[in-house]
């Protein structure tokens, strides 16, 4: 759908064809006797494609675009929050960052983009250099595409909770971290996640691709290291289980530290401190993954860490999350060490 949306920008297909596609996808929300996850899936498909083509549709098909957004707004108003939301949260508390459901978050981001007249800054558009040629291109009308009817055997996108670790106060003053409801935040995170999914089993290419992402983006300077760390931990802590083996995340984070030694290790250490501070409300499975990754990471740096900074854990009961995390980390460190270390 996103590919078809970008084809509108290159004048390959007409705006009307894309509007018809969006309408057919959104009409799924009006079907009877279907699971909510089906409606969520097709609404997300439309919302995630809008940033690429919303400006063009706003200029040429404003009324039709408004009608689609009003239909989505009506659906979001009557929609019930998934029962799995609390089970998928990394933290049991919304302090300091609310843990939003993925569909509610992108709807808030699209609503803010709409208020800003559909202006975004971080989508790479190489075709703008050929605008003089493309403006004369013959646009094509695509045959109507309708979603298949629901079958009990259908598998839809699993519900997700958006992981948030940093905000602008955690970043250097010279950088600007887009807000959680900024579409720029979604675009950057989505592109980094795409790079990770594409290259996760080639750690060097994956790390290089992530760090080179800003070379393709347009707009203000952003603290890319912070966004990368947040995306990586969000993938690592995904519930009920992470998409890839834990070693994928750990090895890529190591290569990121090697490729960007002046800044990335410091940002990663800052993230570890924030995670440690919030262990009290962290999901138990995520604490275990955190300890396993941290021990692996330390094993590649001679197990060096400012352990004195965590002496506060001595004041708690042994089963409190903080001393328990430290104990598990040390156990993993023992497994990863050998006599000469």
Model-identified regions with their sequence ranges:
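Long, low-complexity, highly charged intrinsically disordered regions
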Residues: 79-238, 319-341
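Active-site-adjacent structural elements in folded domains
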Residues: 29-33, 211-219, 233-239, 253-259, ...
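HEAT-repeat alpha-solenoid elements in large eukaryotic scaffold proteins
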Residues: 1-4, 41-50, 200-211, 224-231, ...
